């Protein structure tokens, strides 16, 4: 959270839209960093909204949760002072259209914060064809569903094309090795390996892999965490821009 959110702050009283809040993981961090701002957090999934409400205690926090589609926003133009989007565009078939929809409800002078990963930025040791196979299954499965897990490198072009100004994109590099056990556990194992394992059934259904090859690949990928010389590197990208008009 510090890596991605240490420089995200909103002024007291400002109205912030969080588009694609999921189960509220980022919402909780936003509230922690800007306790006196007001948040509207939306997601297309009602089960996720229910979980987010439970996790943040909506009744006693300055956040309102809303189940809606970000391509059909129920807000007047120029409603929000700021907009925050994290790990959403990679799942969309039309990220350009999503940015334009969101921009329409942002006030002139307001900031737009956008965070995405880039699966093409992944490097690890021990490296192997087996480990790269399951990683590539993750990338290909998302691509076949219309998403783009390599979208991190496109943040600047996307924001520029949408008409934002004062665009600043910064890479947020993650490096995990045995000398940083908290990163090995929290990132390599519980984020990366868990994320790849989560696409197993879809990869099998799509014919991208077989069961034996998948298990061999996951064992190889986990060695980046449990090997005495295991290393995992990954880069997130954070873009902040302003709507002038």
Features from the language model and the residues they span:
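Class I SAM-dependent methyltransferase SAM/SAH-binding core
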Residues: 15-17, 23-73, 97
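Conserved Class I S-adenosyl-L-methionine
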Residues: 168-245
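A short SAM/SAH-binding and catalytic strip from SAM-dependent methyltransferases
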Residues: 81-94
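A short glycine-rich, Lys/Arg-flanked "PGG" loop and its adjoining helix->strand segment in the class I
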Residues: 96-111
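Conserved catalytic/acceptor-binding region of the Class I
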Residues: 113-182, 190
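A short acidic, Gly/Pro-enriched loop at the edge of an enzyme's catalytic core
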Residues: 71-82
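Conserved alpha-helix/loop element of class I SAM-dependent methyltransferases that forms part
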Residues: 1-14, 29
């Amino acid at each position: 959270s510090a890596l991605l959110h240490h420089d995200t702050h909103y002024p007291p009283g400002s109205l912030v839209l969080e588009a694609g809040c999921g189960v509220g993981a980022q919402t909780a961090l936003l509230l922690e960093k800007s306790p006196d701002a007001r948040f509207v957090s939306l997601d297309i999934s009602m089960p996720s909204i229910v979980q987010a409400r439970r996790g943040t205690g909506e009744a006693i926090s300055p956040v309102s949760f809303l189940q809606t589609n970000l391509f059909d926003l129920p807000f007047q133009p120029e409603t929000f002072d700021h907009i925050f989007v994290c790990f959403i565009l990679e799942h969309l078939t039309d990220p350009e259209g999503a940015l334009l929809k969101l921009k329409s409800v942002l006030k002139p002078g307001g900031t737009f914060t956008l965070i995405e990963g880039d699966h093409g930025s992944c490097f690890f040791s021990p490296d192997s064809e087996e480990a790269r196979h399951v990683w590539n299954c993750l990338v290909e499965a998302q691509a076949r569903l219309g998403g783009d897990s390599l979208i991190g490198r496109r943040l600047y072009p996307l924001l520029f094309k949408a008409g934002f100004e004062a665009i600043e994109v910064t890479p947020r590099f993650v490096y995990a090795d045995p000398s940083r056990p908290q990163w090995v556990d929290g990132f390599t194992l519980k984020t990366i390996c868990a994320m790849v394992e989560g696409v197993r059934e879809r990869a099998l259904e799509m014919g991208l892999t077989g069961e034996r090859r998948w298990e061999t690949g996951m064992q190889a990928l986990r060695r980046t965490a449990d090997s005495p010389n295991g290393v995992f590197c990954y880069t997130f990208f954070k873009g902040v821009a302003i709507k002038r008009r």
